[in-house]
Amino acid sequence: MKHSLIILISFLLLSSPVIGNSHKGETLYRWGECCDWAWKGFGDKEIQPKYQGEVENGKPNGLGVIIYPDGIWKGGDKYVGEWIHRWKNGQGTFTWSDGGEYVGSWKNGTRWNGTFYDKNGNIIYKYVNGR
């Protein structure tokens, strides 16, 4: 949980126009089935995952947050971190609504090098090169 706080604070500082890059964040909604998604500037946060953050060519790229609604994941599951061309890439934290979280690096949307914690902060699994 401590790791999520560090990443969240870093994200907020980097996204601040005074401290970080003054790039304006955008809101996108993910449409479609895995993994043939389309990202659109309109949608319903009750149905589609909602992304807020940096965008390039109409896709998440840079720092951003995505929150998943009920029906796809349990409502409130979210990812905070880096994106490259629509995929989670780089450092980030995925937090499940039950309090569990994965903290570490991502590669092409896959957990890569990091740690999965339960809701009490106990280590459940360590990922190395996606395994």
Q: What is each PLM-predicted segment?
A:
Residues 15-131:
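Glycine/tyrosine- and acidic-biased, solvent-exposed loop/turn segments at the edges of beta-strands
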Residues 4-14:
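Sec-dependent N-terminal signal peptides
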